[in-house]
Every structure is written in C-alpha cells, then in structure tokens.
Amino acid sequence: MSSKTAYTELFVSRYQPVEKGKRWAWVLIRTVLVVGFCFIILFPLFQRLSIAFRSKADIYDPTVLWIPRNFTFDNLRIAIETTNYFEALGNTALISASTTLIQLVSCALAAYAFARLQFRGSGLLFGLVIVTIIVPPQTIMIPLYLTYRYFDLFGLVGLFSSKDSLNLIDTFWPFILSSSTAMGLKNGLYIYIFRQFFRGIPKEIGEAALVDGAGVFRTFLRIMVPNAVPAIVTVLLFSFVWQWNDSYYVSLFLKQVKVLSTSLMDMGVGLREPDPVYTSMLLNTGVLLAIAPLILMYLFVQRYFVESVERTGIVG
C-alpha cells in the first residue's frame, strides 16, 4: 500500500465522523426550530379550545390545566348570542368572498399591464403601487371616509338625481368599488405578486399568441391566467384571510352592519359581566368562533397553498 493511499484512507476515516456529526447537529437544530414554531402557533389555539368548554368554576380551580372538569357549552352559547354570530358570519363571508374575487381580477389585470405592456409612466405608476404597500392606510382614513360618505362620480350623481352625492357608508359599495379599482386591502402586494409571476413567464409564449392573432385580453385569458395558477391561489388565500380578519376598513365603512371583527370588539361591552376573568374567557371563546371557519378552510386547501407559495417564491 502506497503512502498516498494510506493518507487518503486516514483522511476519509477522520472526515466521515465529522460530517456525520454535522448532519445530526443540523437535524437537531431543525427539529428544535420546527417544534418551537409549532408551539408558538398552536399553543394559543389549544388554550382557547380548552377555555371554550370550561365552566365558570373551572377558572379558579388550580387543578384544571387543559381538560375541563365541568364540561359545558355555555361559553359558546353566550358568545354566539352576544356577537350575533351567524349574522356576523354571513356578512363577513359575503364581504370576504366578493372582494376576494373582484381583487383577483383587478389586480391580475393591473399586474399584467405592468409586466407586459410598455407605456409611458409605467415605472412611476408601479412605484406608486409599491408606496401603497409601505404607507399605512390610517394616513388616508379621513379622505377615504369622505369619498364614500359624499360619493359623487365626476359630478354625475347630481345630473341624474336630486341629490348632490350618495352616502355609501353602511353598505358594501366601498369594498366593491375599491376592490374593482385595485385599491382595496393589500392590493399593492397582490399586484406585485402577479407582476413578478407574469414577468417569469417567457415572453416568447405571449409573442407567439400575438402572431397567431390573439389580442391583449385574449392572450391574458388564454396564456397568462392558466400559467398563473400558483399566484392566483396565493392571492386568493391571502386576500380572503386578510379581509376576514380586517377591522380597520369595516369599522370605517360599516357602522350598523355586523361583521365578526367588529362584533368581537363590542363583545366586552355587550357581556356586562362583573368578573373580568370570566369576561376574558368568553372573549377567547368568541375569538375561537371567529377563526374556526379559516382553520377549516385551511385544512382543505393547505396542499394547494404550500405548492403555490413554493412556486411563487413568497416567504415570510
């Protein structure tokens, strides 16, 4: 055996344990991180699930940790009655579903224009889209409210009616109009997601469609939309969840209409419970009822959501 061969075998014999140790260390680190993140996310959910079925006596029983001793549905009943749960659930689902579908169309069209159509000022306009992501919506709260409180589309309302303007507050129209113009909740982010995905589609595909006689809209519908399914799923889920949990716009535009987010904010006043600990338990039950539909939805679409996030490159 030559000295070179002996040296190689010695190096390999020493190198393999080191690599194996690094591999096991990386597995341990990943396991700790995954378990830690799961604990952070799932602990509040399991805690609220346990609280929802406890009786008032279980609150002050130090032996009750997770499993209720006096199992009851009273907390759920009180939370449902106080929040007008089913009415609020229907309104929330209607607003979330309608605005999500409208935003999907308007943001995709706007993003397609930024990604494929060359026109003067496109860079400036896209920069303004990015600004809408950065600037908090609270800074334009008063203009937004006044726009829909005294709505007048270029003076056309006065031409066709005796009123100078329309009051769209306490209706769904502010959500529909803002979503139709790609100015709704988080629409700047959705335009950015679609634009980046459309830019990743080879230009040759669109050019071939134009050569075959397809126009801009036909190319968008026949070429871009079928290839943008991952981006569509991502925007669909993000838009629905954000709209479901929104409390800013609904409290600004809907004063009398019941939705889940505002019902939860008013729940503490409606309970009139002198015991603050029991009030907190009922509020936690209300939160659980509000997020339950989202959890059920995620259980059915989680595979599509993970695939879409991986393909669009959305992280964080």
Protein language model features and the residues they cover:
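A structural signal for multi-pass alpha-helical bundles of membrane permease subunits
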Residues: 4-12, 18-22, 26-316
